[in-house]
Regions:
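Sec-dependent N-terminal signal peptides
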Residues: 4-14
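Sec/Tat signal peptide C-region and signal peptidase I cleavage site
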Residues: 16-20
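Extracellular beta-rich repeat passengers
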Residues: 21-56, 66-80, 85-86, 90-192, ...
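Short tyrosine-centred short linear motifs in exposed loops/low-complexity segments
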Residues: 51-53, 472-474, 511
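C-terminal tail/sorting-segment detector
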Residues: 2-3, 490, 494, 498, ...
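Glycine-centered coil/turn sites that cap beta-strands in beta-rich domains
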Residues: 439-456, 460-480, 501-508, 521-524
Length: 534
């Protein structure tokens, strides 16, 4: 941790001001490295984690992406990312302009994004390919490949344009194997797709795509993983020049039948498009809730698609033939609030296909107005509530997910939500204004004992002072936890000489409530309560 120290002698007291500064990450990471929550980090250029290195990121860590250098994190095949955030303490990747006091406002494409590359199968000739954007190679033969863990991670304002029509997605997964853990991820304000899978077998749960620019969930190159509990919400004004869709799925760019076939299995998805009601003005580049094309074979169940000009498009003879023979399906799902057509087909070839009959036979339901689906407040762009009300048709007509060790077989409802809002606590629909420093002042060098004083003021909003004393040189840890015992902020985790210290704690990013702050120094452990009241 880089620090600035200034010493001011006044009578018998002196002060040392300590301000956290970003630790710059650049170039290759070639050995095991840990990013800690008591520091902040800046991605400068392409930061590549090379095999066999492991990048560990503590819960609550904030990593900022630099715009001018195209800051991007790339996990190479054979390397790992271990980013296990918690519900109370998610890991945040965001724009450098999202810092409190920044002279610029964070926006789409302020930095690159996160790219995870693995050794699972993909379908281009030769079984390897160069990832779009930086061009690193990925793909192999190991579908069980493990690229690490990403849990409770927010990715904000990614998707920078490298060149015209060449952007990085929010979270890109290329050839990532099913040994990898991906769940509780929120991608917000991506300048390209929120998520894109290029082949691989990785399974994913609890994904949020919020106010993206291009597509929400894009699958290519033979991706065949399992997914459950996904939600997307769009901004009516923002769409991509290439047209914006919810799902976009291709076997490959030419629609060949190269194997493995793009064939992900989706359960419990809610796709909220840009058009809340018939009078809502939307960007003309918005097209479809799902565009399934180029020989892809998606398997979709218990899904809501609402507020899109067209609900579903099946595109291409091979895709339609897959629908006819049952290797591609959309079962027990709802389309609502469409302005052009609920569903259509393109290029059926010689196949005789009636999409309306196919939809009805698959237990599909269609509603003219979004209000008929009776979700609580799904189009709210600052505090959305995707839960169905008691009268919602989403609570009936669902299929039962398989009990296979991955899918939650109790999700007997249509859409991503039943009675539990799994976005609560960790997700943020108004990201930014992050305070990135904790100020610590040494008040005295002659304490008589280890001590932790009551914070002042208390209750507080949003800042308070905490004074502690160290009787002898010690490793000191001062943390803030919630009432569940989960660490929400690490204020100090360093060696301290004997002295009395004052920490100025800014809790701007925490919600109101009771918190515990605890001091561990030497053999002493002291805890006290404080109340944040906003």
């Amino acid at each position: 941790m880089k620090k600035m120290f200034s010493v001011i002698l006044f009578l018998s007291l002196f002060a040392i001001n300590v301000f956290a500064q970003d630790i710059v990450l650049s170039g290759d990471i070639t050995s095991n490295t840990t990013l800690t929550a008591n520091n902040t980090y800046l991605l400068n250029g392409y930061v590549r984690v090379q095999a066999p290195a492991v990048l560990t990121i503590e819960a609550g860590t904030k990593i900022f992406g630099d715009k001018s250098s195209l800051g991007t994190l790339i996990i190479k095949p054979g390397a790992k990312i271990m980013a296990a955030g918690t519900e109370a303490n998610p890991i945040i990747f965001t724009s450098v302009f999202a810092k409190s006091g920044s002279v610029s406002t964070p926006s789409y494409g302020d930095w690159g994004g996160i790219i995870i590359l693995g050794n699972a199968k993909i379908n281009p000739a030769g079984g390897t390919a160069a990832i779009e954007g930086p061009g690193d190679s990925f793909g192999g033969t190991d579908d069980e490949d493990n690229s690490g863990v990403m849990q409770y991670v927010r990715i904000e304002y990614p998707g920078i344009a490298l060149t015209l029509n060449n952007e990085i997605n929010g979270l890109t997964m290329g050839g990532v194997g099913r040994g990898t853990t991906i769940d509780h991820i929120q991608v917000s304000y991506s300048g390209d797709d929120s998520y894109e899978w290029f082949g691989g077998t990785v399974n994913c749960k609890y994904l949020i795509a919020f106010r993206g620019w291009d597509d929400d969930f894009d699958t290519d190159f033979g991706y065949s993983g399992k997914l459950q509990y996904l939600v997307a919400l769009r901004d009516p004004d923002i769409a991509d020049q290439s047209s914006s869709n919810g799902f976009e799925s291709d076997n490959d760019g030419s629609g060949t039948l190269n194997e493995p076939i793009t064939s992900p299995t989706w359960w419990n998805v809610t796709m909220i498009g840009p058009k809340k009601e018939s009078g809502t003005t939307i960007n003309s580049l918005y097209k479809r809730g799902m565009h399934l094309r180029r020989s892809s074979r998606n398997k979709i169940s218990n899904t809501i698609i609402m507020g899109w000009p067209t609900g579903i498009r099946l595109d291409g003879a091979n895709t339609i033939q897959a629908a006819l023979n049952g290797t591609m399906y959309i079962n027990n799902s709802i389309v609502a609030g469409y302005t052009s057509t609920a569903m259509d087909t393109v290029s059926a070839g010689g196949a005789s296909f009636n999409m309306g009959d196919w939809w009805t036979a698959s237990s599909g339901r269609t509603f003219t107005a979004n209000t008929e689906v009776a979700l609580t407040d799904p189009f709210n762009l600052t505090t959305p509530n995707f839960l169905p009300t008691s009268s919602s048709p989403a609570l009936t007509g669902a299929a039962t997910p398989p009990s296979d060790g991955f899918f939650d077989a109790t999700a007997n409802f249509v859409g991503a939500f039943g009675s539990v809002d799994w976005t609560a606590v960790w997700a943020d629909f108004t990201p930014g204004n992050y305070v990135t420093s904790v100020e610590e002042n040494q008040l005295s060098s002659t304490p008589v004992d280890f001590n932790l004083s009551q914070n002042y003021p208390n209750p507080f909003n949003p800042s308070t002072k905490i004074v502690y004393s160290v009787a002898q040189p010690s490793q000191v840890k001062l943390v803030v936890t919630n009432i569940l015992g989960q660490v929400v902020e690490t204020l100090v985790d360093e060696f301290r000489s004997a002295g009395t210290f004052e920490v100025n704690f800014n809790a701007e990013n925490l919600s109101s409530g009771l918190y515990i702050y605890s001091l561990e120094a030497g053999s002493v452990s002291i805890s006290k309560k404080m109340t944040l009241l906003k």
